[in-house]
């Protein structure tokens, strides 16, 4: 009896793969960005392979648009490579944050095996595929071979049941899962999510949860495909295969979560597993940030805009909203969400990873405090080492921007 992940590795390797086995598996796609791509390209060139262009996806996103000469050099290097070898390529204004683009453009689909040279490649498990973060050198090898060795991961089954309370979303659920198991608590395992609560969550919320399995050290994430999954991919691809766990599949452990008990939550410095109900936190803030591969989708921006409509942010707070892709940006324009946000005093930017990694466009100065929808709040993550980052869902971030301190949306409405 096998888990879905064991079945996928079996099919992709041609072996009877079980957790703990080492296999060489064929990948459907390998993805790099402007930061990880240059090293992958160097490795590929050194090996002298012929590229498997139809399986290579190049998506500049971390320092986009380039913030300085060095980042411009990196951008040019990955673009030149993509154009030379006719790979999939999403340039400025046509793509966005790599993980969002991989989902939007149909690269992620049930049953696929994908490697990405970025730690949050786990995100695509929301669509019932196996997606893993790898190193740049490994990506360069895959450019020419289409294969990679894997240790088949054990599966932690996270059973989440109960109807979430109003204002509780995927971000709050995954923060509470992290609080339960700790950072690194699922190291090199697959975190599979099941239970009645998943039925209430749209693909956006599942993506948020899958994204932050990285913070638990997980090798990958997995959600079973359902009608919401198929609706999401319907106009993107028809090439997929649905895998499910056998009834008597073996799990490394089973963790039960009652979603009905979860409150809107915030992760306080300096760890994503350091979680409190938002009602217990009230620190003053300097910046509020809505965006990233974790919570920069149109659903997130809509929810923030509902809180901000006809209101003004605190005079001492800067609010930044950064959509996860050009598609999200365009949709926000069409729906009038950009006007709502800027009328409230917020700044609506083009798509980039930027501030999430302390790169640019929202970097924090000494002693500053930010509440953010991103995925990490380690020391110095978004700027100066003395700055502080709190993690929360978009509604909480929007409400906090208005109040000038960490606040619940209930205080606004």
Curated annotation (Swiss-Prot):
SUPFAM superfamilies given for it? Aconitase iron-sulfur domain
| Pathway involvement of the protein, from the record | Amino-acid biosynthesis; L-leucine biosynthesis; L-leucine from 3-methyl-2-oxobutanoate: step 2/4
Q: Which domain of life is it from?
A: Archaea
Catalytic activity of the protein: (2R,3S)-3-isopropylmalate = (2S)-2-isopropylmalate
* GO biological process terms on file: L-leucine biosynthetic process
Cofactor-binding details, from the entry: Binds 1 [4Fe-4S] cluster per subunit.
Q: Does the keyword Metal-binding apply?
A: yes
- Short name of any one Pfam family annotated for the protein: Aconitase
Q: Where does [4Fe-4S] cluster bind?
A: 293, 353, 356
This protein's record includes keyword Iron:
yes
In terms of CDD domains, this protein maps to: IPMI (cd01583)
Q: Which InterPro entries does the protein's record reference?
A: Acnase/IPM_dHydase_lsu_aba_1/3, Acoase/IPM_deHydtase_lsu_aba, Aconitase_4Fe-4S_BS, Aconitase_4Fe-4S_dom, HAcnase/IPMdehydase_lsu_prok, Homoacnase/IPMdehydase_lsu, IPM_dehydratase_rel_enz, IPMI_cat
Keywords attached to this entry: 4Fe-4S, Amino-acid biosynthesis, Branched-chain amino acid biosynthesis, Iron, Iron-sulfur, Leucine biosynthesis, Lyase, Metal-binding
Q: Give any GO molecular function from the UniProt entry.
A: 3-isopropylmalate dehydratase activity
What EC number(s) are associated with this protein in UniProt?
Answer: 4.2.1.33
Per its UniProt record, the required cofactor names are: [4Fe-4S] cluster
Entry's HAMAP family?
LeuC_type2 (MF_01027)
Its function, per the record, reads: Catalyzes the isomerization between 2-isopropylmalate and 3-isopropylmalate, via the formation of 2-isopropylmaleate.
- Similarity comment: Belongs to the aconitase/IPM isomerase family. LeuC type 2 subfamily.
Self-association state and partner proteins as the record states: Heterodimer of LeuC and LeuD.
Any idea what this protein is called?
3-isopropylmalate dehydratase large subunit
* Source species of the chain: Picrophilus torridus (strain ATCC 700027 / DSM 9790 / JCM 10055 / NBRC 100828 / KAW 2/3)
């Amino acid at each position: 009896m096998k888990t879905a992940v064991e079945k996928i590795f079996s099919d992709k390797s041609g072996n009877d793969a079980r957790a703990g086995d080492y296999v060489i598996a064929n990948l459907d796609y390998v993805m790099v960005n402007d930061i990880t791509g240059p090293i992958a390209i160097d490795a590929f060139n050194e090996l002298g392979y012929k590229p498997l262009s139809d399986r290579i996806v190049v998506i500049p996103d971390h320092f986009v648009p380039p913030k300085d000469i060095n980042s411009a050099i990196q951008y040019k290097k990955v673009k030149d490579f993509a154009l030379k070898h006719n790979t999939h390529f999403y340039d400025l204004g046509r793509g966005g944050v790599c993980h969002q683009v991989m989902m939007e453009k149909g690269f992620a689909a049930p049953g696929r095996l994908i490697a990405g040279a970025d730690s949050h490649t786990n995100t695509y498990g929301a669509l019932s595929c196996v997606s893993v973060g790898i190193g740049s050198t490994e990506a360069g090898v895959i450019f020419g071979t289409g294969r990679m060795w894997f240790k088949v991961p054990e599966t932690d089954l996270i059973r989440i049941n109960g109807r979430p309370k109003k204002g509780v979303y995927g971000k709050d659920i995954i923060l509470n899962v992290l609080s339960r198991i700790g950072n690194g608590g699922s190291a090199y395992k697959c975190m599979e999510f099941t239970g009645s609560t998943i039925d209430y969550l749209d693909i956006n919320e599942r993506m948020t949860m899958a994204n932050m399995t990285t913070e638990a050290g997980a090798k990958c994430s997995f959600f079973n495909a359902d009608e919401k999954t198929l609706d999401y991919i319907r106009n993107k691809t028809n090439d997929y295969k649905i895998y499910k766990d056998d009834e008597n599949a073996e799990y490394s452990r089973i963790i039960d979560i009652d979603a009905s008990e979860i409150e809107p939550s915030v992760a306080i410095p300096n760890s994503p597993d350091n979680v409190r109900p938002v009602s217990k936190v009230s620190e003053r803030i300097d910046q509020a940030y809505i965006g990233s591969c974790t919570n920069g989708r149109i659903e997130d921006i809509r929810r923030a805009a509902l809180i901000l409509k006809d209101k003004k942010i605190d005079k001492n707070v800067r609010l930044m909203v950064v959509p996860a892709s050009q598609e999200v940006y365009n949709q926000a324009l069409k729906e009038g969400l950009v006007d709502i946000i800027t009328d409230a005093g917020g700044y609506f930017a083009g798509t980039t990873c930027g501030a999430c990694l302390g790169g640019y466009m929202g970097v924090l100065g000494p002693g500053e405090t930010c509440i953010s929808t991103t995925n990490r709040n380690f020391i110095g993550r978004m700027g100066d080492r003395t700055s502080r980052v709190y993690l929360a869902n978009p509604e909480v971030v929007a409400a906090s921007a208005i109040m000038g301190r960490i606040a619940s949306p209930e205080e606004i409405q």
